[in-house]
Amino acid sequence: MLQTLIGVHSYMPWCYEIPAMAIFLRSTITLPIAIASLKTARRFVQVQPLIKEAKKRCRTNTDFRTVRKKLYKRFNCHPLMIYALPITQLPLFAFASYQLRQAVDVCPESMSTEGMLWFTDLTLPDPHGVLPAVLAVTYLTNMSILKRPSDSRLLKIFNTAGIMSAFFVSFMAFKTSTALSLYWTTSAIYSLVQNVALRKLL
């Protein structure tokens, strides 16, 4: 992927290539998963009344878990599938960030001069902290949209982990190169627009 980044750089400056990279990866990899995840989430919400009724009816937790498992299978809405998107995004995030960090090391001269607006040097942290701040707000807004009320311990763990990761990545954005902050922020904004649009269209 590093060679591809350097190759594409022959046709556009880094300040455009980095956002384009984020949009391309989001559109080709995470968008299809997001669509499937949203459909699963809606089926999950629809089956909640049946699960609550089963919880009242079942005498033991073992019976309840058995019935709940059958309902998830029947409606094809296992809670884990709702979080297929963040589970997929984690390795993609790590891989893309690593490749971009390598690009900063390999191409320091062009990275230091091909920024834009207030961040002209992509090898340094955002001088005004604007991108990290936007990243934090976007992440938290996304989490509020994706959060699903549920008694499932697994979903509660994912919700908590999502909020913690949002604060961690936003904090790191204040310390790392603007190249990475630009990629993370573009990716987060794309994700937010994607989630809002899908909820209106699907």
UniProtKB/Swiss-Prot annotation:
Protein's cellular compartments: Mitochondrion inner membrane
GO molecular function annotation: membrane insertase activity
Mitochondrial matrix compartment residues: 36-74, 147-168
GO biological process: mitochondrial cytochrome c oxidase assembly; protein insertion into mitochondrial inner membrane from matrix; protein insertion into mitochondrial membrane; respiratory chain complex IV assembly
GO cellular-component term (any): mitochondrion
InterPro entries, per database record: YidC/ALB3/OXA1/COX18 (IPR001708), YidC/Oxa/ALB_C (IPR028055)
Record's bilayer topology term: Multi-pass membrane protein
Key words of the record: Membrane, Mitochondrion, Mitochondrion inner membrane, Transit peptide, Transmembrane, Transmembrane helix
Source taxon at top rank: Eukaryota
Family from the record: Belongs to the OXA1/ALB3/YidC family.
Function description: Required for the insertion of integral membrane proteins into the mitochondrial inner membrane. Essential for the activity and assembly of cytochrome c oxidase. Plays a central role in the translocation and export of the C-terminal part of the cox2 protein into the mitochondrial intermembrane space.
Protein name per UniProt: Cytochrome c oxidase assembly protein cox18, mitochondrial
Lineage of origin: Eukaryota, Fungi, Dikarya, Ascomycota, Taphrinomycotina
